[in-house]
Amino acid sequence: MSGLIAYCRQGFEPELAAELRDRAVLLGIASDIHAQRNHGFVLLRCDPLHVDTLLQQLHWRRLIFARQTLRLHAELKTLNSRDRIAPILAALPKTPCFGDLWIEYPDSDMGKPLAGLARSFGNALRPVLRSAGRLSAQLHPQWPRLHVCFLSGDHVLLGSTRSVDSAPWQLGIPRLKLLPEAPSRSALKLEEALITLLTPNEREAKLRPGMCATDLGAAPGGWTWVLICQHLRVTSIDNAALRPPLLNHPLVQHVRADGFRWIPPRPMDWMVCDMVEQPRRVAERMAVWLREGWCRHMIFNLKLPMKKRWDETRLCLERFETQAAVPLTLRAKQLYHDREEITVYASNDAR
């Protein structure tokens, strides 16, 4: 069996399946995609000769609806609860030796009850793999990592990935803690966006103390708070009030205005936007900000409709890129802390 495993948000399996199918077609690769709603993952099966190409081109950072992508090695069904280890050992590829082991389960209503089994099974499997020479005694991040994904007590997917090419969190979910002083839980969305959509080097270069930012539709202030934690000076645009600790903060200027109509008096380094509005309208307004040179970098959310979400995603991103009319770095992702939405990062490469 050859192909890919891709984790996603429960309920967005059809969107991920459509994204994978379209991307494979563009690459000229025939694929068989299996997705069931609310299962939290999608399987893509293909000719073994094409797996490496797909893993490279369908990297988790390049996919919008995938939290993690893995090389699929085997699917094991009807496992005996008295001995799950022997069939797993037998199904592993002859090479390589793995440098790490993650025992996982889908982030879904069916998968979450398997968390206890995953923890205990990892403790049992790890020493056996090491004794068999299939797992290094010490962590080796440069070696492939083995993923054992439980779909049920007797149903397992075996996959692998290179640590440097994969999401660095189990299940593809970053574990972020909401600090008590954060004005709202929406702060977690921007925090996750910064660590997911930007590389460490990009964060260091593009989020420097003293930079200027605008937060459109800022109230109650979750995204503004994240920016001032990065020591940026923020102009928060909203007719509604901001919550403490943003009131009278030296890095925050609150302007009571409509975020869709306000124009900055000078170019900004950053603009962020999490307004609840039709996604096409948001995409068009964001494009204006880049086209007019009002900012260099931006992060914004697109609230998706209940139906045809993949079609709407493609349309909005294509319209945004066309109307921005500047050279762009463009990345989009449905984050763990997103709901019926995606988060987009765009940067004007010409400035």
From Swiss-Prot:
GO cellular component, one term: cytoplasm
Catalytic activity as recorded in UniProt: cytidine(2498) in 23S rRNA + S-adenosyl-L-methionine = 2'-O-methylcytidine(2498) in 23S rRNA + S-adenosyl-L-homocysteine + H(+)
EC code(s) of this entry: 2.1.1.186
Main location: cytoplasm
The entry's keywords: Cytoplasm, Methyltransferase, rRNA processing, S-adenosyl-L-methionine, Transferase
InterPro entries in the record: RlmM_FDX (IPR040739), RlmM_THUMP-like (IPR048646), RNA_MeTrfase_FtsJ_dom (IPR002877), rRNA_MeTrfase_M (IPR011224), SAM-dependent_MTases_sf (IPR029063)
Compartments reported by the entry: Cytoplasm
Pfam families: FtsJ (PF01728), RlmM_FDX (PF18125), RLMM_N (PF21239)
Enzyme class: transferase
Annotated GO MF terms: S-adenosylmethionine-dependent methyltransferase activity
Superkingdom in the source lineage: Bacteria
UniProt: S-adenosyl-L-methionine binding residues: S186, A219, P220, G221, G222, D238, D258, D274
Protein's name in the database: Ribosomal RNA large subunit methyltransferase M
Organism per entry: Xylella fastidiosa (strain Temecula1 / ATCC 700964)
Name of the gene this protein is made from: rlmM
